[in-house]
């Protein structure tokens, strides 16, 4: 089955989800999605769409379709990708509002948005997989059996979109994320880390920084080895603080 064609994020968010036709999306396919309104890529897979690609999901309800990339092949598929980087075409050194709402395009580099991630993990239990690739074409991954964003908060934003991960499984990458569990998300304009300085500014990114990081997957796209300290796309337990990765994907699937 073919995936829905990608559209710019703002266009999709401003388009009525059950319009008879949207440019780039066949009317019958859109109608089918309007009727069933998938929450995530698990739902899309169950509906018979089992090819990698961009689809619409509805984490906040029927009136707001959100484009997302679904990985339908890795380890059985059904993965909802919330972070994807592979060529440095999109700047990830952004402020709080961008990280809250999401940015980029689902058919390219993008961030799904903290609010969408919170709503997903509020409604279902998820596992997390982090896929990594270096510039020598070596690959590795890390998995976590439990993943959620501020699951018990009255207001997820006031709670800082706190990260919770547990149940690490090594796919060669090592565990660089457990250090960040229990920490609020930080950007250069909203410093919520535990360090005396602003970790997001120091690390040229945005993440669930503590003091500061072992993972910096939203850092600068520096193209491999770099002289600057810990401000690239770093996963310290695999490549250290002086190597910026070529490709990263952070994705969740129902546990």
UniProtKB/Swiss-Prot annotation:
GO terms for biological process: cell adhesion; cellular response to UV-B; elastic fiber assembly; regulation of collagen metabolic process; supramolecular fiber organization; UV protection. Residues 1-21 form the signal peptide. Glycans are attached at residues 87, 137. Pfam families: Fibrinogen_C (PF00147). The keyword Lipoprotein does not apply. InterPro entries: Fibrinogen-like_C, Fibrinogen_a/b/g_C_1, Fibrinogen_a/b/g_C_dom, Fibrinogen_C-term_domain. It is found in: Secreted, Extracellular space, Extracellular matrix. Keywords: Calcium, Cell adhesion, Extracellular matrix, Glycoprotein, Secreted, Signal. Residues 32-255 form the Fibrinogen C-terminal domain. NCBIfam families: GGGWT_bact (NF040941). Homodimer. Can also form higher oligomers. Interacts with FBN1, FBN2 and LOX. Interacts with COL1A1 in a Ca (2+)-dependent manner. Interacts with ELN in a Ca (2+)-dependent manner; this interaction promotes ELN self-assembly. Could be involved in calcium-dependent cell adhesion or intercellular interactions. May contribute to the elastic fiber assembly and/or maintenance. PANTHER family: FIBRINOGEN/TENASCIN/ANGIOPOEITIN, MICROFIBRIL-ASSOCIATED GLYCOPROTEIN 4. This is Microfibril-associated glycoprotein 4. The gene is MFAP4.
């Amino acid at each position: 089955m073919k995936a829905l064609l990608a559209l710019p994020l703002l266009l999709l968010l401003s388009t009525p989800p059950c319009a008879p036709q949207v440019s780039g999306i066949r009317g019958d396919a859109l109608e089918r999605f309007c009727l069933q309104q998938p929450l995530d890529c698990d739902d899309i897979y169950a509906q018979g769409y089992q090819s990698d690609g961009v689809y619409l999901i509805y984490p906040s309800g029927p009136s707001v379709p959100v484009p997302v990339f679904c990985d339908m092949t890795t380890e059985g598929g059904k993965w909802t990708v919330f972070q994807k980087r592979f060529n440095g075409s999109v700047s990830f050194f952004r402020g709080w509002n961008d990280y809250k709402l999401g940015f980029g395009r689902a058919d390219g580099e993008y961030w799904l948005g903290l609010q969408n991630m919170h709503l997903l993990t509020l409604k279902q239990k998820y596992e997390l997989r982090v896929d990594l690739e270096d510039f020598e074409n070596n690959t590795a991954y890390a998995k976590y059996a439990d993943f959620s964003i501020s699951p018990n908060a009255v207001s997820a934003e006031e709670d800082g979109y706190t990260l919770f991960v547990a149940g690490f499984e090594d796919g060669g990458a090592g565990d660089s994320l457990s250090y960040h569990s229990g920490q609020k998300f930080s950007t250069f304009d909203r410093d919520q880390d535990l360090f005396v300085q602003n970790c997001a500014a120091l690390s040229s990114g945005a993440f669930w920084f503590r003091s500061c990081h072992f993972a910096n997957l939203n850092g600068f796209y520096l193209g491999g080895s770099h002289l600057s300290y810990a401000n690239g796309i770093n996963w310290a337990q695999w490549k250290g603080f002086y190597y910026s990765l070529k490709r990263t994907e952070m994705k969740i699937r129902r546990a």
